Amino acid sequence: MSTTRTDRVACGNAGDMDLHIWTPDQRPKAAVLLIQEIFGVGPYIRAVAERLAVAGYLVGAPDVFWRFAPHWEAGHDPAGLGASMEKVGQLDFPAAVGDVTAALAHLAGQPGIEIAPAVLGFCLGGTLAWAVAANAEPSVCVSYYGSGVPDMLGMIDQVTCPTLFHFGSEDAFIANAGVDAIGAAIAGREGFVLNVEQAGHAFDNHESAMFHNEAAAKAAWAKTMAFLGLYLPA
């Protein structure tokens, strides 16, 4: 189990963003910035955060849509998907990268944290994790099915941390050609890993019957925890 709180992170003149914090029972020395999917910081993201906290990590999950839809949460069903896609259309992506980078710095400054936190994101958060890794210095980047990543490979030389990508071979939202481009771009780069599961988009999301693939989720999560354990032990 963990204890939870909500911190406020200054984001320039725009105001303050909520950063939900999970603290493990034992004093943490490593942290993970967990970046939401389009459905918000809802039951699924909170469950992932708790899983990471049980593993010993301090976890922070920023409220990415705070500038126009604070505390956004949507159902993990077709109606929620449609509503969430509308919210994504309102997102100022560069501003969101700045906000998440500020959250990373805040998490890095918490007591006991010895080195830079990891960034771990799902869907929209997978794209943001990659962008933040290119603009800041996290210890590790784990990106789950970030649909924007194939179009952002030009920033790969800016990413200096070990990076693990997860995609599904049957993802209707991300072309296999884009995933292949990632594989080609990271070939020969130490610490960069591409994992492709036989699954569709958002396969880790246990809250969504239309997306979840239990076998793929378990396999990818085992790889994620091994990757974190190698480069950022709790």
Predicted regions and their residues:
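N-terminal cap/leader regions of alpha/beta-hydrolase-fold enzymes
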Residues: M1-A234
